[in-house]
Amino acid sequence: MRVPEVKQTHFTLIKLVKQTGFTLIELMVTVAIVALLASIAFPMAEVAAQRSKEQELRYSLRQIREAIDSYKQAWDEGRIQKTLGESGYPPELKDLVGGVKDAKSPEEKYIYFLRSLPRDPMSIDEQATAEETWGKRSYESPPDDPQEGDDVFDVYSLSEREGLNGIPYREW
C-alpha cells in the first residue's frame, strides 16, 4: 500500500516557520523578567562588596591595634629603650614594621610587630602609602577629638562614609 504524498504549498511552509520562532511578546516578557532579576541582584552585590570591605577594615584595625599594644608591652617590659617623657607607644606606624632594637638582647636583635602595614580598605587615594591612609591618635589626644602627636596610640579610618551598621568608619 502506498502512502499518498502530501503536497506542500507555500502557505504551509510559512505556517511552519512562524510556529518555530519567538513572538515579540514572548521576547519582551523574557527581557522584563531578566531586568527584574538584575535589579534585585545588583543592590545585593553592592551590599556584599561593602560588607567584605568592612570585614577587611575590622581585621586591619585589629591587626594594627594589637601591634601597637605589643609595642607598648615591650616598652613596659624594658625591651625598648626608654626615654624620659615618652608614653611607650610607637612614634610612627612604620616603627611597627621596621622594628626596634631589643634592649635586652645581647646580640642587639630587632623586635618586629607587623610584617607589613595594611592599607585602609576604605581609602579612595590609591597613591597614598599605607601609613597615610590611616588617621592617627596620640596618647595625649582626647578620644572624642583625635589628633596626631609625638606617638601613635590608636588608628582610625579617614573615610567619611558610614558602615552598614550606621556608624561612621572613623568611629570604628
Residue ranges and their predicted role:
Residues A49-D76, G88:
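Membrane-proximal N-terminal amphipathic helix
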Residues D69-W172:
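Low-complexity, acidic interaction segments enriched in glycine
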Residues R2, K18-A45:
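N-terminal single-pass transmembrane signal-anchor helix
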